A protein has these predicted regions:
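N-terminal pre-domain/capping segments
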Residues: 1-86, 90, 156, 160, ...
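Conserved beta-strand positions
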Residues: 5, 32, 63, 95, ...
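Acidic-and-aromatic substrate-binding clefts and catalytic sites of carbohydrate-active enzymes
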Residues: 8-15, 32-45, 67-76, 100-105, ...
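Conserved active-site loop/cleft motifs that coordinate metal ions or position small ligands
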Residues: 187, 224-232
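Active-site groove signature of glycoside hydrolases
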Residues: 85-105, 127-137, 228
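Alpha-helical scaffolding segments of alpha/beta enzyme cores, especially the outer helices
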Residues: 17-21, 44-51, 55, 76-87, ...
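Acidic/histidine-rich catalytic cores of soluble enzymes
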Residues: 16, 29, 119-208
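A structural motif
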Residues: 27, 90, 185, 223-224
């Protein structure tokens, strides 16, 4: 497993500064936020980010797009979003599945999302890119079952899940979900409150669930992708926070590798 930092972890700093912090701390890659840090995604902006990351020794692991499959706007938007990911030199493009939660969907809404994901995965593969599906409330991937069914229905080697903990789940439920979804995941986001269903992020070492046990589930499944810090505690200076999270995750990854 490799450790990455999502540039959305600090939306106030210029993206170049976030990249510098990531490199200084020791992260191996970054996920580039697809809004303010990228502007309109023109060739010059992407080239600048790609060059800066390369000079700092960072992979652009993911382009964090807001492309939504299964919606009317997908057909007109996906080629442009793939071009941005390509310009950045990203390994994966993050996408959003539908605009309703699993269980609230109609069969046609689910099938539309699956069809779009297959199309996207095929076109992405032509560019040497993979697709990662955001697991998030308000989307078809909000539940374990919804996320599992989506990935299984798409059934494409270059399309997986961007797993992240949803704080409505208990620690036991999170661990069970991780065991089910780790084999279907190609990216991981980590963030946490100190208490279940909390709003304020804390250091990952203070998470209400055992982050190390979660990573063990992924290690057992043979996961070898990025584990990315997404949102961080606001109680300390930014660089100190992402450094602490990196040190903690590094210790857990090394332990998992040796167990």
């Amino acid at each position: 497993m490799q450790l990455g930092l999502c540039t959305i972890s600090n939306t106030e700093l210029p993206v170049e500064r976030v990249l510098q912090v990531a490199a200084d701390v020791g992260y191996e890659g970054v996920e580039v936020w697809g809004k303010d840090h990228l502007g309109d995604g023109d060739a010059d902006a992407c080239a600048s980010i790609r060059q800066t990351a390369g000079e700092l020794g960072l992979d652009v692991a993911v382009y964090g797009s807001y492309l939504t499959v299964g919606t009317d706007g997908f057909a007109d938007a996906y080629e442009r979003e793939l071009t941005i990911a390509d310009r950045l030199g990203a390994d994966l493009i993050r996408v959003w599945p539908g605009d309703c939660e699993y269980g609230d969907h109609t069969p046609s809404e689910f099938e539309s999302a699956v069809t779009d994901l297959r199309t996207l995965a095929e076109r992405a593969a032509e560019r040497g890119l993979g697709v990662t599906i955001e697991k998030h409330k308000g989307r078809l991937s909000n539940t374990t079952e919804g996320a599992r069914r989506l990935v299984d229905a798409v059934d494409h080697p270059d399309c997986g899940l961007n797993w992240q903990p949803l704080f409505v789940l208990s620690e036991r439920e999170l661990l069970a979900e991780a065991e089910t979804l780790a084999p279907r995941s190609n990216n991981v986001h980590l963030q946490a409150p100190a208490e279940r269903d909390g709003d304020e992020r804390t250091l990952l070492s203070n998470a209400y669930f055992d982050v190390g046990t979660v990573l063990e589930r992924f290690e057992s499944a043979g996961y070898d992708g990025y584990v990315e810090v997404e949102f961080v505690s606001q109680d300390r200076p930014y660089e100190d926070t992402v450094r602490r999270d990196h040190e903690y995750l590094r210790s857990l990854v090394e332990k998992a590798d040796h167990d």
